[in-house]
Amino acid sequence: MTPSVMDRAVLTMAAFGTGMLGAASFVWCFLFRSLFASCVLERAVDELFFWGSLCVQVMMLFFCFRKYSKTLSRYLDLICAVNIVALFGCLICLQYKMGFRTYLPILFSLNLIWLSVWLPVTFEAVYLCPPYANAYFQLGFFTATTVHYLLLSFGSVTTSFLFIPFACFLIAGLYSLRVLKKQEEFKSAILDRRAIFITRDNLYVTINFSVIPSFIGMELCVVAVMTVGFAVFMTAAGVYTDVVKVLKTYLLMFQFGTFCVGGMGYPSRKATFVYCMTACILMPLVFVLQDLTIKSVLFLAIFFLFINGVTCETTIMLAKLKKGINGPKIVLSVCLLVNICITLSLNVLYKVYIETLKK
């Protein structure tokens, strides 16, 4: 049955709202770093922000290897309520200027653990739907992060108003997730993945992780080569140029790059080649040019090309794994591994730069 225009519109809006929910853990890190940097010792905040965000992505990887859908679905409302309560707890610490070195880091860390649930849950739901919904998920993800970035850029960094959009995105995102799971296109996607021989523990076709290389081995190799290549370039740029001075600005983007590419990730190896070759042509300019602003723009452009190349490959992976109910989880695990590798390289590079300045 072909979905009507109204059905597609509802799925589009639901995917957009679900994308805002998926960005919750990254926005939480961004808010904490921006709002409380002046309240807590700078070193302590940096350590918590840098390494805490990496740990939460490792936790998301754990979710990719677990059957959690049925269990978590019963407690999503409770998890959202816990997130809101923790948010108000941090708001009280900010308002009354207390617990900056005790309660605040604890609240931040505990809430970050609970927020880590949302990206795996939303990613799996949306990426089981038709491809057009994926682009709107990415748009919602980008909107949630951009709204908070703009509020911080054009307003006071100490205002508690910044927590209001975050709470709204949580509530609206959870509602959107509920709506999305009621759509016929989502239900059809679930039915298409039902196993031929159904047992109690095997309702759907599941791709075993041991056979993944036979399905997407080439794509995994291409992604690995691109990731290593970009990490080497980033390290060289940090060592031999002064672009490292502004690398901290890119940190948030590096953490969610593979989840937000503006819909430019096409399922084509030719597109991957074009992105990679363009990036390779631009890389030497970062070492040759003198103007820091131009080099920073080029660095961001190369990162954008790298991420789109990776997304082309993950889109191909998703197409090859479309028969498995856990196909989106496998793709999510690849995206997380890329993010973790790049963010870890950036963090280490920036820490070395900070230590060098202290000497």
Curated annotation (Swiss-Prot):
Family listed: Belongs to the herpesviridae BMRF2 family.
Major localization listed first in the record, in broad terms: host cell
Key words, A-Z: Host membrane, Membrane, Transmembrane, Transmembrane helix
Disulfide pairings: none
Location relative to the cell: Host membrane
Name of the molecule in the record: Gene 58 protein
Signal peptide: none
Bilayer-spanning residue ranges: 12-32, 45-65, 75-95, 103-123, 132-152, 154-174, 220-240, 246-266, 271-289, 296-318, 330-350
Keyword Cell division found: no
Membrane topology summary: Multi-pass membrane protein
Organism for this UniProt entry: Equine herpesvirus 2 (strain 86/87) (EHV-2)
UniProt GO cellular component terms: host cell membrane; membrane
